[in-house]
Amino acid sequence: MKVLVIQQRMGIGDMVIFLSYIHAIAKKENCPVSILVKENSRADEFLKQDKHIDKIILLDRKRNAMGKHSGILGFFKLVKELKKEKYEKVYIFNSSLRYTLLAKFAHIKNIIQYPLFKKRGQNVIQTAKKFTEEIVGKTVSSQPKIFVDEKMISKAKTKYTFSKEFKHICVGLSASGPTKRWDIDRFISTFEKISKDHPCKFYLAGGVNDSILLQKFINSSLGKNSVSFENMSIREALPIISNCNLYVGNDTAWLHLSCGLGLKCIALFMDSPTIYGKYSSNINIVVPENQTEETTSHNTRGKDKISIEQVFQKTKELLN
């Protein structure tokens, strides 16, 4: 049977969060599934080794209507692409009528979807979990799993000298905006304190847009034991992260990738809902000192109220 799963939330983090549900559906169907996902999910960069997924279709819809799937003409281009695949069943993690019509026009007979027109107020994780559990008829773990070739992990271990003499920490310096990014000087101070207790190496998770932050870390006393991901693809970085002991950083894509690779994670939430860190027991949430996990959300603006001591103590606890 050819099965399609449509997951249309934006971003890498959302893609990782939905993985456990996609895997559960593939296991129920006893076959790999195709996924239709947004381009900025970057699914093609970290899911190509996933045995539960046989095809990744990227939805190319852009706000300026220049994407090949934008508008009415783009809709029917996508219909044509899906028709060629001859899918027999589709699971739609979305309440939009657009995807119902897409499936019908693509001649997919068996359509299983969120209730239509019910998007407002949906809990992203609980809605997906309930939907999947009703399909498979049993409890589904929300812990995602990202597959990386063992040979690539072993190669990275040798190349970057992952010695047991050191603790290896993936550092999530990047974020989607300045209010969600803990100050770089606080990261440095925290890890200087940690390094007095444990010899550490640091793997700096950030891209070209984070070059100033990355350079400041590298120019610090920690620089000689640091590796930057600035010029690496996600695919190149994953085997390195797989060898790490811990993730410490902002609520960013690297947090969710690290979680999916099985790392214990310390996630700093200062201006976004902590619900995005509660789907996995691997994630340990730190919030501003004047907030709780329930009150921390959009517009908390608490980056200056997460102390070095908070992060130091939590890091020390998990490293021990």
Q: Predicted segment positions?
A:
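Catalytic machinery of carbohydrate-active enzymes
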Residues: 1-320
